[in-house]
C-alpha cells in the first residue's frame, strides 16, 4: 500500500491538471490505524532486519514526499489516526478533524518511538511541550482536541464531509490553490468543545513537567506537582498528571529515553533530517529486544505484561541512548529527494 500511495502521489504532483489531493480512510472506522508492525517484527525475528527496515525506508520516503508536495493535500482524519496514519496526514497542508477523530502516537508502549516524522511535527504543531507529552504517554486526543492541540488545521463535522468533497471537486483543474482550498475548508468549519477532562486545560502544568531534561526529571516534576495540587479545585489537573505517570510507567524505558532525546533534537531539524534520524533509530530498535516484546505483549499474546530489557530507567545509560542515534554504515542511510515545502502552518 505504501508503494502504491507513493507512486500515485508522485504522479499527481507531476500532473498539471491535478490541483489538489484528498486523502481519506476506507469506511467510517479509521483514517489509518498504522502499519502492520506484527509483520515487520516477524521479519526481524527471523534475522532479516534488512527486509524489516525496508518497510520503514519506504514509509519514511512517503512521509518526505508528502512534506515536499506543492499540490495541496487534504487529509480527512475521520476515525482512528495512529502511528503511520499520522505520517500520511501531518506533513500535508491541511488536516481535517471530525467529532469521530481519535489520534495517538502509542509507540513507547510498544517498545518503539514516535516515528513517521513525529520528531518534526510533535514539537512544532503542538504548543510548548505538549507534543512531548503525547509522544511519551501515547495519550489519545479526540474530536476538537486535535484542532485545539494544533494537529488539525480545521474541524468539520462528519455529516458535512460529502458536501465538502463536492465543494473541493468543484474547484476544478484551474481553480484550486492553497488559498482556495483553505477558503473552502473554512466554509464548512464549526467550533467544537474541548472536554473538561482534556489535558489541554492544563498546558502550563504539562509544559513545566515535560520540559524536564530527563525522563526521570519528568516523573519527578509530575509527582511534585501532584503533591502540590491537593485541593479539590485542582482535582482535574491532578488526574491528568497521575494518568501521565501511569502511562510513563508502562512504556519501555529505552523507548522513553530515546523519545525524549529524539523530540528535543527534532525541534532543530528539517523534516528530511528528522526522518533520516528516525531511520537510524528504527534500525537499532529492530535489533533490540523491546520492540518485539512490546508487539508480543500488546498485539500478539495480549497479556499486557511486556518484560522490558533493560527494565528500569536507571539501567538505560546516556551512552546506550546516544548509540541509537549514531550514523549507519555507508550505503544504509535513508536517501531522500528534495526539500520539504513551506507549510501554511507551523511545519
Predicted regions span which residues?
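Charged catalytic carboxylate motif
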Residues: 4, 58, 254, 258
Amino acid at each position: 500500500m505504501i508503494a502504491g500511495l507513493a507512486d500515485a502521489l508522485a504522479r499527481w504532483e507531476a500532473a498539471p491538471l491535478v490541483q489538489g489531493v484528498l486523502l481519506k480512510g476506507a469506511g467510517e472506522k479509521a483514517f489509518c490505524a498504522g502499519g502492520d508492525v506484527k509483520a515487520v517484527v516477524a521479519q526481524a525475528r527471523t534475522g532479516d532486519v534488512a527486509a524489516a527496515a525496508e518497510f520503514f525506508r519506504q514509509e519514511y520516503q512517503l512521509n518526505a514526499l508528502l512534506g515536499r508536495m506543492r499540490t495541496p493535500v487534504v487529509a480527512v482524519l475521520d476515525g482512528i489516526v495512529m502511528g503511520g496514519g499520522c505520517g500520511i496526514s501531518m506533513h500535508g497542508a491541511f488536516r481535517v478533524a471530525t467529532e469521530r477523530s481519535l489520534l495517538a502516537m502509542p509507540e513507547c508502549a510498544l517498545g518503539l518511538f514516535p516515528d513517521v516524522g513525529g520528531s518534526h511535527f510533535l514539537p512544532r504543531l503542538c504548543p510548548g511541550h505538549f507534543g512531548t507529552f503525547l509522544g511519551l504517554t501515547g495519550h489519545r486526543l479526540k474530536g476538537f482536541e486535535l484542532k485545539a492541540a494544533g494537529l488539525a488545521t480545521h474541524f468539520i463535522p462528519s455529516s458535512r464531509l460529502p458536501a465538502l468533497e463536492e465543494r473541493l471537486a468543484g474547484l476544478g483543474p484551474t481553480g484550486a490553490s492553497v488559498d482556495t482550498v483553505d477558503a473552502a475548508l473554512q466554509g464548512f468549519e464549526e467550533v467544537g468543545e474541548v472536554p473538561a477532562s482534556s489535558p489541554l486545560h492544563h498546558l502550563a502544568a504539562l509544559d513545566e513537567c515535560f520540559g524536564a531534561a530527563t525522563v526521570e526529571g519528568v516523573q519527578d516534576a509530575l509527582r511534585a506537582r501532584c503533591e502540590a495540587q491537593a485541593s479539590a479545585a485542582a482535582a482535574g489537573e491532578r488526574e491528568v498528571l497521575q494518568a501521565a505517570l501511569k502511562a510513563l510507567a508502562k512504556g519501555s524505558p529505552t523507548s522513553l529515553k530515546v523519545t525524549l532525546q529524539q523530540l528535543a533534537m527534532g525541534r532543530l531539524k528539517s523534516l528530511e533530517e528528522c526522518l533520516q534520524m528516525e531511520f537510524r533509530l528504527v534500525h537499532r530498535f529492530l535489533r533490540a529486544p523491546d520492540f518485539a516484546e512490546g508487539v508480543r505483549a500488546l498485539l500478539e499474546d495480549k497479556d499486557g505484561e511486556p518484560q522490558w530489557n533493560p527494565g528500569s530507567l536507571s539501567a538505560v545509560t546516556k551512552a546506550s541512548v546516544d548509540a541509537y542515534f549514531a550514523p549507519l554504515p555507508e550505503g544504509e542511510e535513508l536517501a531522500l529527494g528534495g526539500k520539504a515545502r513551506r507549510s501554511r502552518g507551523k511545519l
